[in-house]
Swiss-Prot record:
Signal peptide: 1-28
Its biological purpose: Component of the spanin complex that disrupts the host outer membrane and participates in cell lysis during virus exit. The spanin complex conducts the final step in host lysis by disrupting the outer membrane after holin and endolysin action have permeabilized the inner membrane and degraded the host peptidoglycans. Host outer membrane disruption is possibly due to local fusion between the inner and outer membrane performed by the spanin complex.
Protein name per its UniProtKB record: Spanin, outer lipoprotein subunit
Protease recorded as keyword: no
Lineage: Viruses, Duplodnaviria, Heunggongvirae, Uroviricota, Caudoviricetes
Annotated spans, Disordered: 91-113
Localization annotation: Host cell outer membrane
């Protein structure tokens, strides 16, 4: 017959410590919650020259038929500049949407689809 080997006391203490501590280590993080990380959104700046006020040509004094004709031409040029500025803002908005539509969703939203 084979004799059972007796474990030495330091080995028994080590095994007992492992048996007592391992369940605590395995269940210690079971109730922890992951805090959501806020996403940082940096919006692109719109050019300041596009948001500046368009100068309005002053009304000539005295307002004659000839001066009125020149003033209307100046007003139409100012209106044209406003329309070009608005078109540039629309182009920048389209570019911004294209950039931010390509970004991954925060929190791994692509995996949930």
């Amino acid at each position: 017959m084979m004799q059972k080997k007796k474990l030495q006391p330091p080995l028994l203490v080590t095994i007992a410590a492992l048996v007592l501590c391992l369940p605590l280590l395995l269940t210690g993080c079971g109730n922890s919650k992951n805090a959501p990380v806020p996403s940082v959104v940096i919006l692109p700046e719109i050019d300041t020259e596009l948001t500046e006020a368009t100068p309005v040509p002053p009304m000539p004094q005295p307002l004659t038929w000839g001066a009125s004709l020149l003033w209307n031409a100046d007003l139409l040029m100012a209106l044209g500049q406003c329309n070009r500025d608005k078109a540039s803002v629309r182009e920048q908005e389209i570019r911004r949407k294209e950039i931010y539509e390509r970004r991954p969703e925060p929190g791994g939203g692509a995996a949930a689809r």
